[in-house]
Amino acid sequence: MAESYLQNGFRRKTLSVKVGNLFVGSEHSIKIQSMTTTATTDVEGTVRQIYALQECGCEIVRVTVQGLKEVGACEQIKDRLVQQNVTIPLVADIHFFPQAAIHVADFVDKVRINPGNYVDKRNMFSGKIYSDEQYTRSLERLFEKFSPLVAKCKRLGRAMRIGVNHGSLSERIMQRYGDTIEGMVFSALEYAEVCVNMDYHNIVFSMKSSNPRTMVAAYRALARELDQRKWLYPLHLGVTEAGSGMDGMIKSSVGIGTLLSEGLGDTIRCSLTGSPTLEIPVCLDLLKETAKYSKSTKKYNPFEIYHSKQLTTQTTPKHFPVENVYGFLVGLTKDHLLTIEPNTLLQCLGVDITTGKKDLTSPDGVVIPKSMRSSAIVSEIEKHLRIFYKEDAPILNEMNEELWLSDKTLATPFVYFEVESIYQARRFFALRQNYSQPVCLSFSLKANLSKNSAAIDLSIRLGALLLDGLGSCVLFNFSDLKLARTLGFSILQSANIRSTTVEYISCPGCGRTLFDLPEVSQRIKERTKHLPGGLKIAVMGCIVNGPGEMADADFGYVGSKPGMIDLYVKHKCVKSYVPMENAEEELIQLLKEHGVWKEPE
């Protein structure tokens, strides 16, 4: 199991960082952020969007600042906000252009810089090797270029975010540390050292990735490193380029929710493709669902768990329900079996009643009461899916701890464990870490939750355990079987455990976006969603972060200039300046050339 961060007490202790008229840090509420999607030079449009964000609960808002035109626009935006009594702090997002950062600090409350491209050039996979002398010189250059911004922010009382993106580490960092968590951490620490040496402490850190597993590991590692140095700076949490809709919400919740549940995080942003106002309800639900962990009287410190024998990567024993993959089961109640017509029930389980073919998101099996084993409908289900009887394995939970390690329990092929909270489940696995008996994690929907709130709750409870390698199988006990399949497989995929559908990496859009990102993303999704699981397709609005943040993708569609698209295979641009009206067909052609395309059935 990966090391978790949680220490005694709940929130990681931090300094208070002043951002405009509010504070970020452990002594204050966790702040919700978003970013405008309008062109920053569209002053009126940007002000309207900022006002709309504030109205729905956003507490800090960021705008993109590509150059000096946007710097001038920020002055006007801030003036308009003051005139309209809109007090939300304004943040400038900077990439590649240090001078813009220095100038815009006059007009905004906070500046975000990316260590991967503020001074050094982004890694272009050139294979360049830095000698120790060259590396030292590059650090001196970093100080020369970065220290003026630090000095100005200190003088004006501005805040700063040192925001590392996994996909845009600098060439120098990549050469020394590789594409690693360590590289992400030291990319941030190099800039932090300049701030500390200049006695400037109004800083916040982020360690974003489109992969929740990478993101969680990076934040945990950074928090430990900062605390060892007694640099108690706040953390801004986010899964970058999470995508859209339910899948994007789940991916964000797996990453952000895991960290919030262990006391990490002082401000959050859910990067969802579409209108930024859609991000705020997700953030509010995340904070609501993770707040219960701070109130728990049974906190468990997962720092004590360094390894679990229930690793998701191991091959499961032959007698376990599902071999060689992390299994997904659904529970069928008597009500399901007695009131739903057999063909309808099979369709709800993803079985084509005409061909008998199972959908990629059909469960690996169903769990039913033993009293129903002789019914005709069970015989019909058994033709298509494996059946397990609820009473054949112990059902463990917080209320029967005396059974967890009993001889009778340990003699069974596997056990179910009902997960009510992350703490309780981690404690269960810690006590059993010397036993190889497989565990099926069992989940039920909590009462009175909306569909979105239920998805967020399950993403946190299951996602945190998946990221730490716990369990061998999951069982969802829902009345809505289609919802169980949708949520179950999406969470497994978001945690990089099991891929069943195409994964889409798409940015939320910002003032740099060169096309209608939600519309194009949806069109590409509709044309490719039938392709096999495991494939990753990125749709990115511009070339500033696009090529880096889609480094995990197999294929990429990236805005290069107005009306033009660059197409990527892995991190290599293979077609440049493709007219937008042809770009989707060209993407399909690339998929065909690389042998991953198939015609829809």
From Swiss-Prot:
[4Fe-4S] cluster binds at C507, C510, C542, E549. Converts 2C-methyl-D-erythritol 2,4-cyclodiphosphate (ME-2,4cPP) into 1-hydroxy-2-methyl-2-(E)-butenyl 4-diphosphate. The keyword 4Fe-4S applies. SUPFAM superfamilies: Nitrite and sulphite reductase 4Fe-4S domain-like. Pathway: Isoprenoid biosynthesis; isopentenyl diphosphate biosynthesis via DXP pathway; isopentenyl diphosphate from 1-deoxy-D-xylulose 5-phosphate: step 5/6. Belongs to the IspG family. NCBIfam families: ispG_gcpE, PRK00694.1. Its cofactor is [4Fe-4S] cluster. Keywords: 4Fe-4S, Iron, Iron-sulfur, Isoprene biosynthesis, Metal-binding, Oxidoreductase. This is 4-hydroxy-3-methylbut-2-en-1-yl diphosphate synthase (flavodoxin). HAMAP family: IspG (MF_00159). Its EC number is 1.17.7.3. It catalyses: (2E)-4-hydroxy-3-methylbut-2-enyl diphosphate + oxidized [flavodoxin] + H2O + 2 H(+) = 2-C-methyl-D-erythritol 2,4-cyclic diphosphate + reduced [flavodoxin]. GO terms for biological process: isopentenyl diphosphate biosynthetic process, methylerythritol 4-phosphate pathway; terpenoid biosynthetic process. It holds the Pfam family GcpE. Binds 1 [4Fe-4S] cluster. One of its GO terms (molecular function) is 4 iron, 4 sulfur cluster binding. It is an enzyme of class 1 (oxidoreductase).
